[in-house]
């Protein structure tokens, strides 16, 4: 059970919450702050004070005053009208993440909701009632209005949820769990939907997968180095410390550890003086991707604990301030950066695939074919990898450089952060498939070189891989092989745990 405070949630805790189904509870001190902040909202309504989103309309209607008797209807209408999401739903892990992050931001005690609302969100998390949230329709400012409106619907007993492996109406799940829908009161609808939790939840899942994929890329690249009898000197500690990037130094160190007892690597001048960049520059390129990952993690952990709705309430109600913390620009930039960093891992992997299958670049059988000419072997696998990396180049175009005005030009600059976050996740899926192709080719090359000559780590990884796909002894439908390895990498490493050198043993 993880305790939410509004201030301390980490990526590691989100892994447990999203991927292992761990439950949540609220910090009592934080809940007290929620209750105290709510008292401020009640006084604002009682006194008829003009405060945006509490006693006024929204967006362009911010100058329209709302009568006391209409305050509840205002919040209900807000959720109904803003539930304009379209397209396929977010993965269930992402909608679970939205619930967790929305509850966590409310626990900062500046949003003005009743403790009941926070408790309801936590009930959904712990009972695994997850909203069906369409992926498209958010501009990323004022936050993720459309996606979070679909989340808010289920508190009202409306909309759809994922529940016990099925997609059902929210009331089906609430009734089975003995829960009653709630009626939103002043500010609560706005506090539920005005924030960045859709782009951030998708970003968190993307980061978790990206981190593990980056480790996998090092292990697969190490197997390729063996298959091509790469020069180990390029990974010498002195070279990388001379440049000074810690991520580059760390990648080189992990590669050296993986290959320390390999009989397939060569020394400088033994077979050739230098390797091609796709081998020699693995620490420099992969290390740069790790710089991106470290940046993204830092920004996500800030946003996971951020108050992102509007207005915010401070100093016991002395200050009720309309601001713009809902603007998703920080996450939009981070997700666009993640897209570039991960796409490059696929780019360099595809070049290693080419070196494994091109007979002009190695002394392996052409296209790793068992009978070159009669059988094509891995020829079209390289085509598939080339297609994926080209698709990634399109997806990697920054969403955050775009903006379009909305709400009659009141909201005249937006982040497109949710688009960036969604595209980052798509890129990561493509990267994993490219790495799967590289692994299939690297395993085949390793067999040609002699499995007994592989390092302890890569040999173990090879045997695990061969449990998923057999050797290429005849042409067959290789699409199945690629998907099998892809699924194996995702479910055995990127979903469960960080891959380190010893994970393959």
From Swiss-Prot:
Residues in cross-link 5-imidazolinone (Ala-Gly): 141-143
Single GO biological process annotation from the record: L-histidine catabolic process to glutamate and formate
Main location: cytoplasm
UniProt cross-references to Gene3D superfamilies, sorted A to Z: Fumarase/aspartase (Central domain) (1.20.200.10), Fumarase/aspartase (N-terminal domain) (1.10.275.10)
Domain of life: Bacteria
EC number(s) reported in the record: 4.3.1.3
Protein name from the UniProt record: Histidine ammonia-lyase
């Amino acid at each position: 059970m993880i305790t939410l405070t509004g201030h301390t949630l980490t990526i590691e805790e989100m892994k447990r919450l999203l991927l292992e189904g761990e439950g949540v509870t609220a910090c009592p001190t934080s809940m007290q702050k929620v209750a105290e902040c709510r008292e401020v909202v009640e006084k604002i309504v009682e006194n008829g004070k003009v405060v945006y989103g509490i006693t006024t309309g929204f967006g362009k209607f911010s100058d329209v005053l709302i009568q006391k008797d209409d305050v509840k209807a205002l919040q209900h209408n807000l959720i109904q009208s803003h539930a304009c999401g379209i397209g396929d739903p977010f993965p269930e892990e992402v909608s679970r993440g939205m619930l967790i992050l929305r509850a966590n931001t409310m626990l900062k005690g500046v949003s003005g909701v009743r403790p009941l609302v926070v408790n309801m969100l936590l009930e959904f998390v712990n009972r695994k009632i997850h909203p069906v949230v369409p992926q498209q329709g958010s501009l990323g400012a004022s936050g993720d209005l459309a996606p979070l409106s679909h989340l808010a619907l289920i508190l009202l007993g409306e909309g759809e949820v994922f529940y016990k492996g099925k997609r059902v109406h929210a009331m089906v799940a609430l009734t089975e769990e003995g829960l009653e829908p709630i009626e939103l009161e002043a500010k609560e609808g706005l506090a539920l939907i005005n924030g960045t939790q859709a782009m951030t939840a998708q970003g968190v899942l993307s980061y978790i997968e990206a981190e593990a994929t980056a480790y996998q890329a090092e292990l697969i690249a190490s197997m390729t180095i063996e298959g091509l009898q790469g020069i180990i000197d390029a990974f010498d500690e002195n070279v990388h410390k001379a440049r000074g990037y810690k991520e580059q130094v760390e990648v080189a160190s992990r590669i050296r550890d993986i290959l320390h007892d390999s009989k397939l690597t060569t020394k400088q001048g033994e077979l050739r003086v230098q390797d091609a960049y796709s081998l020699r520059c693995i620490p420099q390129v992969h290390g740069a991707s790790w710089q991106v990952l470290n940046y993204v993690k830092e920004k996500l952990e800030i946003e996971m604990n951020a108050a992102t709705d509007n207005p915010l309430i401070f100093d016991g109600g002395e200050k009720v301030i309309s601001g713009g913390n809902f603007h998703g620009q920080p996450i939009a930039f981070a997700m666009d950066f993640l897209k570039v960093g991960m796409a490059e891992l696929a780019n360099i992997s595809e070049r290693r695939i080419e070196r494994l299958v091109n007979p002009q670049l190695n002394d392996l059988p052409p296209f790793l074919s068992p009978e070159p000419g009669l059988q094509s072997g891995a020829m079209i696998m390289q085509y598939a990898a080339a297609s994926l990396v080209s698709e990634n180049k399109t997806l990697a175009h920054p969403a955050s450089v775009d903006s379009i005005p909305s709400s009659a030009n009141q909201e005249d600059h937006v982040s497109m952060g949710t688009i960036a976050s969604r595209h980052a996740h798509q890129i990561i899926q493509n990267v994993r498939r490219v790495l799967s192709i590289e692994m299939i080719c690297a395993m085949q090359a390793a067999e040609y070189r002699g499995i007994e000559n592989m390092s302890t780590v890569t040999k173990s990884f090879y045997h695990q891989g061969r449990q998923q796909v057999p050797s290429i002894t005849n042409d067959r439908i290789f699409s199945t092989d690629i998907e099998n390895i892809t699924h194996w990498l995702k479910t055995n490493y990127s979903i469960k745990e960080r891959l380190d050198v010893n994970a393959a043993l």
